Amino acid sequence: PGRGAAQLDAEVSVAGADGPGELVTMRLRGAMASHTASVALPLLIPDAPVVVWWASHAPKAPSQDPLGMLARRRITDASLAARSRAELQMHASQYAPGDTDLAWTRVTGWRALLAAALDRPHAPVVSAEISAVRSSPSAPLLAAWLHTSLGVPVSMHASRGPGITSVRLHTADGEISMTRRDGVKTLLSVPGYPTSEVSLRRRDTKDL
């Protein structure tokens, strides 16, 4: 963007695999890439909800970006950045209602599994730990959620991945653990119950 001759390539899809309605995909190059809001605005239907998703590099403050200002929901993906955790912290510092990062969406399965495990009778959780590849932006979000939900200290440890590989909750009766080594299956262990294998596949962006 911003280099070469100004160019606009567009593709229009009508009620197909992408869902009902019309989908317009535009690729802006050169100087035109600096005027995304001006290009998109004439295509918007008055009062219709607008969602902006930055499929690559996102602005520092999505809600203050000219294109982001047109949207009710702004979606970023910190995992695409070279320094993904720093990217997530930057977006958090500029957060505005309507901002969403896919790093949070990626922990939905973990949160559901943790909630199911904690639905069983158990001793109070006194601490927790998360293991994940060092660059994972989802791990600190899951840690913050656990800390807020349980009110206990949560430590993070580096692993070889992929992504988050384990969550352990420490109780007086033993350890509630969820371990995923291959990015697909997770072993769930709860004191007093047999260990079970649960599907917890790492989801592609298109599945989020």
Tell where the protein language model's regions lie, with residue ranges.
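Contiguous mid-protein beta-loop-alpha structural module that forms a pocket-lining wall or clamp
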Residues: 37-106, 115
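Long, compositionally biased intrinsically disordered terminal regions
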Residues: 150-151, 163-165, 170-208
